[in-house]
Amino acid sequence: MIALIQRVSEAKVVVDGATIGEIDKGLLVLLGVEREDNIEKMQKLATKVMSYRVFSDENGKMNLNLEQAGGSLLVVSQFTLAADTGRGLRPSFSGAGTPDQARELYEAFVDFCKSKGVNTQTGQFAADMKVSLVNDGPVTFNLQV
């Protein structure tokens, strides 16, 4: 399971001209599901995302996690993160989870984060989305479990 996280000062997702998810300070999470992923991996990754210290403390050091910084999550499904780009000029998605598996784990990820008290907004699974953000830093990390 893969989470590309970006520290943002604002981010939103638009589908068919309507904003469906929007946050101010927090993390934009692009979430990719691979074939071997399961609930245990999802919980481990969600915990890591929420606990990862990417926000600045009073000394300007990346020392605060999402809760300590008072941030929110915007979680967007992104199957292209599971692409194999090692050969040729076209990505292979053979390692990506099935649509049903990906939907189940994406929804479980969102529910898990909400259950921990984190303000969690979402995109729309399998939709054509327009994602806009202001990357604060920029700060971007690729987390995998």
Curated annotation (Swiss-Prot):
Keywords: Cytoplasm, Hydrolase, RNA-binding, tRNA-binding
Chief subcellular location: cytoplasm
Cited function: An aminoacyl-tRNA editing enzyme that deacylates mischarged D-aminoacyl-tRNAs. Also deacylates mischarged glycyl-tRNA(Ala), protecting cells against glycine mischarging by AlaRS. Acts via tRNA-based rather than protein-based catalysis; rejects L-amino acids rather than detecting D-amino acids in the active site. By recycling D-aminoacyl-tRNA to D-amino acids and free tRNA molecules, this enzyme counteracts the toxicity associated with the formation of D-aminoacyl-tRNA entities in vivo and helps enforce protein L-homochirality.
UniProt subcellular location: Cytoplasm
Biological processes annotated in GO: D-amino acid catabolic process
UniProt note: domains: A Gly-cisPro motif from one monomer fits into the active site of the other monomer to allow specific chiral rejection of L-amino acids.
Presence of the UniProt keyword Plastid in the record: no
Name of this chain's protein: D-aminoacyl-tRNA deacylase
GO molecular-function term, one example from the UniProt record: Ser(Gly)-tRNA(Ala) hydrolase activity
Protein family according to the UniProt entry: Belongs to the DTD family.
Subunit structure: Homodimer.
First-level EC class: hydrolase
Keyword field contains Hydrolase: yes
